[in-house]
Amino acid sequence: MNEARARIIINLRLSMDSLMRVFSHRSPPPSFGFACDVGAHPSSTAQNLPMTYGSVREMIDDFSIVFGVPKYRTSKPKKVTRKFSFTRLLQPIDNLVTCPACSNIHPSDTICDACYAKVHQLTSEIKKKMMQYNPYVGEKQDKEVYVKFRGEPDAPAAVVKGKRVLEIEKERPTWFKKLTLKE
């Protein structure tokens, strides 16, 4: 019964709105809201029941927020104008520096691409050697690693103690930091 009364009030409100639109030639006025008690007390059963609609129009009016999408597609030229408008001018990059090692230009807050490629190649080589020993462990190895390049003297036993020695068949690059050989 409460739902029937609520439905009647909603239908009455919608018909009043449509009548006001017909008789007024200006913009539509704000919709009327009835302040009345639909039930004696708020019933929990009315809230649990699924909403039933008398027509498709009532359903559309109730869910009008769902249809808040653009009516027409934005054309391709309009999108391109937004993207490449004259207001979007090119900005100069002012944080470029020259790499002291290889003379390449790069942003001041990053490492040079050419230098990074050299470091990446050497570390990849070291990782491959580590994985040849025990490929099932993955990145986390069971022992620490001491890297020995060709032409280097043997490290003291105290430095190598408990570590796996990886021998690389190339000279140590000048930029590759030597580990301290203190006991």
UniProtKB/Swiss-Prot annotation:
Its main location: mitochondrion. Component of the mitochondrial large ribosomal subunit (mt-LSU). The mitochondrial ribosome (mitoribosome) is a large ribonucleoprotein complex responsible for the synthesis of proteins inside mitochondria. It comes from Caenorhabditis elegans. Zn(2+) binds at residues 99, 102, 112, 115. GO terms for molecular function: metal ion binding; structural constituent of ribosome. GO terms for biological process: translation. It is found in: Mitochondrion. Component of the mitochondrial large ribosomal subunit (mt-LSU). Signal peptide: none annotated. The keyword Methyltransferase does not apply. This is Large ribosomal subunit protein bL32m. GO terms for cellular component: mitochondrial large ribosomal subunit. The keyword Nucleus does not apply.
